[in-house]
Amino acid sequence: MSLNLILTHPGGSHKDELLACSLLAAVHRVPIVRREPTPEDLADPTIAVVDVGGEHAPERNNFDHHQFPADHPPVCALSLVLQHLGVYEDARQFCDWLEPAEWFDTRGPNVTAKWLGVDRNTMTKLNSPIDVTVLRRFAKAKHLEPGEPLWEILNYIGADLLEYLRELRTRLDSIAQQAQIWTVDDHEILFLPRTDPLPDEPSAGIDRYLATIGKATSVAALIYPDRRGSGYGLSRHNDNPLYDFTRIDKQPDVHFAHARGFVAKTSAAEIGRVKELLGLARV
């Protein structure tokens, strides 16, 4: 259902409703108003009521969490909007900042700091003036229309987040179809063959893919297409010390090996030769 308006509470602003409004703005491109909702607003499915109203009713586009019991799992307005858009599970998996944001909004800074295993002052040191300014300006606004600078910033934030989630999901599905896992002695190697066309960043998403299949620690090295050449890139995974690619820097078909040994590029396209180079780089 199309929206005509996004409504959230007035006063101080937090990341959860700002991001929730940003997502809805990116999808529906409608004004954002900051005021208390009326019963008519809550009953109107063309008005999204975010982080206020005491009701979670996605069928009417009402996304509040404050009525949930104190022992409810940490869920904020952003969580509810992500669920509504069908991307919550991917967001929890791919956005490392989301779960802390849910905790911060529902449990407060002290409990969140304890949950993260840091002190409150450490969290304060991570504050950014970008966050402060955008939240402050959003809190001062009463009505934002498409085309206005702050509305467009929110739209960019929401659009970029949705694009990131959808493109990463597509990329991971592609890697899952193409990747091979080789077993070498007591560890594994991920090999990603060349395709036509190549993705813009052939190595993008590999770390996330390995985490999703439970091989983040067992894979020691990666082999993937070199987007600047006809061969492959070879790199350590998680800086695993089993491989030092400076050991192959004198090979005639290796045109780059980083001085720190964590990555190399070869023009070799034949898999047997790539495996040979990998063996030569073994410490």
Located regions from the model:
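C-terminal accessory domains and tails appended to enzymatic cores
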Residues: L3-N4, G11, K15-S22, A43-T46, ...
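Generic marker of "main functional regions" within proteins
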Residues: A25-R29, R34, E59, H72-P73, ...
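A basic- and aromatic-enriched beta-loop-alpha substructure that forms the phosphate/nucleotide-
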Residues: I47-T133
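Glutamate identity and glutamate-enriched acidic tracts
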Residues: E36, E40, E55, E89, ...
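Short alpha-helical "patches" and their helix-cap loops
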Residues: I32-D41, A91-F104, L116-V118, E152, ...
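Short, surface-exposed loop/strand segments
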Residues: M1-N62, P69-A70
